[in-house]
């Protein structure tokens, strides 16, 4: 089936921000003005189109990345609305991996907030061009210029104003477009009637100053424009737009617009900016991968006549269609009902149906082309991060990396009937979410589920009950500790069994040594002269890995360790993979015990926003929680306190903060790093254990 929309007229964008900056409201307005919905849904009354999960509607937050398609000025815009809560950072990460551009929404009162920093860095990692939208210009304390400054200082980025606001707070009525030098105001509540007015006299100086900065930036993007500018010639609107687009696509500058989505002001110019300044799939570099046949790097260009390649970025279980896989087509075309090759798993898959998504509504289509973001039913083996390709031209695109979970809870089914259902349900939820992990404790028979934060696990448990009808008892949250070593040790593992007939023989000598924090695990084979035959080396590594899943102090996973196999011996008849695996496991346990093992705990980056009257009390409380204050900042009568605090000390903090600040303080926290548990705390834990 032929392509309906040319690639140059396609935009794949994300909407990203801190929680409560107004992303979902902005998306709702975009859907309204592009004619995708005929009434505006509000987040606060649970009617937002893009927040379609029950949990999202109840909490007024976005949890999953909902995808939708809309049209503006004969352009097709595929939008992914991403969550702002730190527990769902993985949703942002996997969306940014498949997008070409993004709208970064900031609260014009608060400026850059902690999660906006995280999301901005994620977008930097994938070099995603962005336009900035300063939302909530109608709120008390909204400050366009101060917010721009905070983008510059906190993010180290270069924002460039393409609009400035007409008024602020309750006097915010419209904008001045610096590209066209025109002022306009909104004359109706729905924001559909826009009237041009003369630029107010008191703003002519500000307009001249910021337009000059814009023209200077535009001139720097192109030699011809620079000559024109230096000769004092007028740059046309077209010249200016070309310059802004060039700087945006190069991820050097970030055009800044403003508005109030809730008051229906500023969304149409934002859509114009998406079309004018953000990239089409043809503007971004070819996607890189590894050719499976040759092992060499290969590239795929966004063209329909290239071999098919796509990246699965999300898997979800839909109550009506079953397993639904979202993927981005990077090159080529795929038809409904056709076979594709999962190059990551090296398996053939059949696409049952292709679906164009609109939040949770779907429209069946016959084919997907390069640049499309699409849902597919029928892919049995594909999981998040897998590459789909043409079997004749297999390629593996760079997969996504996800953070390790930091918090766990024990979960038990209430009845025997719930037991089987719970296993299936947890497995399905783990398929959807790469940061959600399940572990069974053989000794206690308990199931441990782990995630990125309390809210993350709360949502999982809620979904178990509502979607899968599983009744379960939930334990108290537990911290995902790890163990590591501080010293170097050598140990020997010898496994010999003789029970008549063929025996078992495995013998290894290994050395363990610490790695830098966050480096994980490394295995090094230093065998010379075949004292341990090559065919047994993988079994040794497997034994080592299995032994490190349970440390010698408390049974927590051992991290940041290098294990080297340095010596050993074998028996020509009795040696086997099993014997070497067991010998390696025995050696590692001994070596770790002799290498000064220590306990590691997750440290969270905490930001508390509160009135200055309560600062002393809150700081002393954070100190009592083993917190380390890293920064304090003043914003009017508000103080921002930043600290690194162990997760173990943060349970119940929200309630404590509310009572200490009479409900006027709030906090956000996100995982930062692992650090050694102080000896006195570790000793207490050992006595309890």
From Swiss-Prot:
Location(s), subcellular: Cytoplasm
Positions with a binding annotation for GTP: 17-24, 81-85, 135-138
Annotated tr-type G domain residues: 8-282
Keywords: Cytoplasm, Elongation factor, GTP-binding, Nucleotide-binding, Protein biosynthesis
CC annotations in GO: cytoplasm
GO biological processes: ribosome disassembly
Primary residence: cytoplasm
Annotated GO MF terms: GTP binding; GTPase activity; translation elongation factor activity
Pfam families: EF-G_D2, EFG_C, EFG_III, EFG_IV, GTP_EFTU
PROSITE patterns: G_TR_1, G_TR_2
UniProt entry tagged with the keyword GTP-binding: yes
Family: Belongs to the TRAFAC class translation factor GTPase superfamily. Classic translation factor GTPase family. EF-G/EF-2 subfamily.
PANTHER family xref list: RIBOSOME-RELEASING FACTOR 2, MITOCHONDRIAL (PTHR43261:SF1), TRANSLATION ELONGATION FACTOR G-RELATED (PTHR43261)
Role description: Catalyzes the GTP-dependent ribosomal translocation step during translation elongation. During this step, the ribosome changes from the pre-translocational (PRE) to the post-translocational (POST) state as the newly formed A-site-bound peptidyl-tRNA and P-site-bound deacylated tRNA move to the P and E sites, respectively. Catalyzes the coordinated movement of the two tRNA molecules, the mRNA and conformational changes in the ribosome.
Full protein name: Elongation factor G
Organism of this sequence: Desulforudis audaxviator (strain MP104C)
């Amino acid at each position: 089936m032929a392509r309906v929309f040319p690639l140059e007229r396609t935009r794949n964008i994300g909407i990203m921000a801190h929680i409560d900056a107004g992303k979902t409201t902005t998306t709702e307005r975009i859907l309204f003005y592009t004619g995708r919905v005929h009434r505006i849904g509000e987040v606060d009354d649970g009617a937002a189109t893009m927040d379609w999960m029950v949990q999202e509607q109840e909490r007024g937050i976005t949890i999953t990345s909902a995808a939708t398609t809309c049209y503006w000025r004969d352009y097709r815009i595929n939008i992914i609305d991403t969550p702002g809560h730190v527990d769902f950072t993985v949703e942002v990460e996997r969306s940014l991996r498949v997008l070409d551009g993004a709208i970064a929404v900031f609260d014009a009162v608060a400026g850059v907030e902690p999660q906006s920093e995280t999301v901005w860095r994620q977008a930097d990692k994938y070099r995603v061009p962005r336009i900035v939208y300063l939302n909530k210009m109608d709120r008390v304390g909204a400050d366009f210029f101060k917010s721009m400054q905070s983008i510059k200082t906190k993010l180290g980025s270069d924002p460039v104003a393409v609009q400035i606001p007409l008024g602020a707070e309750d006097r915010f009525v419209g904008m001045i477009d610096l590209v066209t030098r025109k002022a306009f105001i909104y004359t109706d509540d729905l924001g559909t009637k826009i009237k041009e007015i003369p630029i107010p006299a008191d703003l002519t100086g500000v307009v001249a100053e910021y337009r000059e900065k814009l023209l200077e930036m535009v001139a720097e993007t192109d030699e011809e424009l620079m000559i024109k500018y230096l000769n004092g010639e007028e740059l046309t609107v077209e010249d200016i737009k070309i310059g802004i687009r060039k700087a945006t696509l190069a991820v050097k500058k970030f055009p800044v617009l403003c508005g109030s989505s809730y008051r229906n002001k500023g969304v149409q110019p934002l859509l114009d900016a998406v079309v004018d300044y953000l990239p089409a799939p043809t503007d971004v570099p070819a996607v890189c991968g590894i050719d499976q046949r040759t092992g060499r790097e290969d590239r795929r260009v966004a063209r329909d006549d290239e071999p098919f390649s796509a990246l699965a970025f999300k898997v979800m279980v839909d109550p009506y269609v079953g397993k639904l896989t979202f993927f981005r087509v990077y090159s080529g075309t795929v038809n409904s009902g056709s076979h594709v090759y999962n190059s990551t798993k090296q398996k053939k898959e059949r696409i049952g149906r292709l679906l164009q998504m609109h939040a949770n509504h779907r429209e069946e289509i016959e084919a997907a082309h390069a640049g499309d973001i699409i849902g597919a039913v029928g892919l049995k083996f594909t999981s998040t991060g897998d590459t789909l390709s043409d079997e004749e031209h297999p390629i593996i695109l760079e997969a996504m990396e996800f953070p390790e979970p930091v918090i766990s809870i024990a979960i038990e089914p209430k009845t025997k009937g719930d037991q089987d259902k719970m296993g299936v349900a947890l497995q399905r939820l783990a398929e959807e979410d790469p940061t959600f992990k399940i572990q069974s404790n053989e000794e206690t028979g308990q199931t441990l589920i782990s995630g990125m934060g309390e809210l993350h696990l709360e949502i999982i448990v809620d979904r178990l009950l509502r979607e899968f009808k599983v009744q379960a008892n939930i334990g108290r949250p537990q911290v995902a500790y790890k163990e590591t070593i501080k010293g170097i040790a050598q140990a020997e593992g010898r496994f010999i069994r003789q029970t008549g007939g063929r025996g078992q023989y495995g013998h290894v000598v290994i050395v363990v040594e610490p790695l830098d924090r966050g480096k994980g695990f490394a295995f090094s084979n230093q065998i010379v002269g075949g004292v341990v035959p090559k065919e047994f080396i993988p079994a040794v590594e497997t034994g080592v890995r299995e032994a490190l899943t349970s440390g010698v102090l408390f049974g927590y996973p051992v991290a940041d360790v290098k294990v080297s196999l340095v010596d050993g011996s074998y028996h020509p008849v009795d040696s086997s993979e099993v014997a070497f695996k067991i010998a390696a496991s025995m050696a590692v346990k001994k070596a770790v015990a002799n290498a000064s093992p220590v306990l590691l705990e997750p440290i969270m980056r905490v930001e508390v926003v509160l009135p200055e009257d309560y600062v002393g009390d809150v700081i002393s409380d954070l100190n009592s929680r083993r917190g380390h204050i890293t920064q304090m900042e003043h914003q009017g009568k508000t103080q921002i306190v930043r600290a690194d605090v162990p997760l173990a000390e943060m349970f119940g903090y929200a309630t404590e903060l509310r009572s200490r600040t009479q409900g006027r303080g709030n906090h956000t926290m996100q995982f930062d790093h692992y650090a050694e548990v102080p000896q006195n705390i570790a000793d207490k834990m050992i006595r309890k254990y």
